[in-house]
Amino acid sequence: MNIDYVRSILPHRYPFLLVDGVIEESEDRIVAFKNISISDPVFQGHFPEYPIYPGVLIIEGLAQTAGILLLKDLEGIPLFLGIDEARFKKEVRPGDKLIYEVKKIGEKLGTVQVEGVAKVENTIVAKAKLLLGVKKK
């Protein structure tokens, strides 16, 4: 599923839409991707001589991927409520294709906990547990 599908679900827009497409999706799991381009404005400052995609944006990409999973059956604004066990394993550079794998691991009192893993060429570059909610419009 391409960017049109992503835009039909998420409220985010360029330059803060950090998911380019969805590879597969089920009720409790989703795999999405982001192509990392040197033309991304973030590389003007992070870091011009040796561009590295910021870890915080990788985590946001995982959260947006989780948002697609949550919002496909709901309407509202996705809320990023918390993060645990975040780890960054390897740098991400322009030309890389980030793969976001997110699965639901729990639901309680209107919140959903997910486990997210970001990979480049099947190597884990980051992972975290995220807590999300949906604010009704």
UniProtKB/Swiss-Prot annotation:
Protein's recorded name: 3-hydroxyacyl-[acyl-carrier-protein] dehydratase FabZ
Organism of provenance: Thermotoga neapolitana (strain ATCC 49049 / DSM 4359 / NBRC 107923 / NS-E)
Keyword presence, Magnesium: no
Organism taxonomic ancestry: Bacteria, Thermotogati, Thermotogota, Thermotogae, Thermotogales
Active site: H46
GO terms for cellular component: cytoplasm; membrane
GO biological process, one term: lipid A biosynthetic process
InterPro entries hit by this protein: FabA_FabZ, FabZ, HotDog_dom_sf
Family membership: Belongs to the thioester dehydratase family. FabZ subfamily.
UniProt function note: Involved in unsaturated fatty acids biosynthesis. Catalyzes the dehydration of short chain beta-hydroxyacyl-ACPs and long chain saturated and unsaturated beta-hydroxyacyl-ACPs.
SUPFAM superfamilies: Thioesterase/thiol ester dehydrase-isomerase
GO MF annotation: an example: (3R)-hydroxyacyl-[acyl-carrier-protein] dehydratase activity
Catalysis performed (reactions): a (3R)-hydroxyacyl-[ACP] = a (2E)-enoyl-[ACP] + H2O
